[in-house]
Amino acid sequence: MNDTATRVETRTWTDEVLARVRQALPMGLLGVAVGTAGVIGARLVAHAHGLDNSYTVRDPAAITDAFWFVGLQSNLGVMLWIAAASCCLLGAALLRGVPGARRSARFLLASGLFSLWLGLDDGFMLHDEVLPNWQGIPEIALYALYLALMGAYLIYFRGTIFRTKYPLLVAAGVGMAASLVIDQFFNSHFFEDGTKFYGIVFWAAYLFDATLTLVRQEIPGL
């Protein structure tokens, strides 16, 4: 009797593990694909520039033998961009399919994708170096594109934005605008990057709070 019960428990546990493995398989395969693309892509970039693989796989401070805090504020800004993007995309996933929450889900999706792109831009200096120098796209044209996208974002989602603590968004805009003005007309990294960092902090704070607010509004009792 005890042996039979043990076999049943073992079979049940095994079935549970196999079921979890099957459920995790699609995301696991995606993880393998992304990881492989990152590893191979980094090596291809190094090879294309005639550099050792270490230049694209190790930390910049280790490669340049610099202090650990080199780029500290910039790195923190990139972390905030990506954290804000992750928060928004999770919120969009939670609201997907919720009746009447389509506009909120779209707002969070757009906010997340925009934040993700800005984080990648900031981290890899896309608008500063890569696109102007390698693709011939003027930096001012990229600024104009970003401003146009932000304008469209504000107009299209204005109803949703007014349901959130939008003064935080205004503060983010002031910080970013001040950084752009200082970059174009003055020569002060302290003030340019300082106001930009404030803008990123307020942008992230706004989106963290907006995600929480909208999810609670659209899913009562959560």
Predicted features, each with a name:
Residues D3-L222:
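Polytopic alpha-helical membrane-helix bundles and their juxtamembrane interface segments
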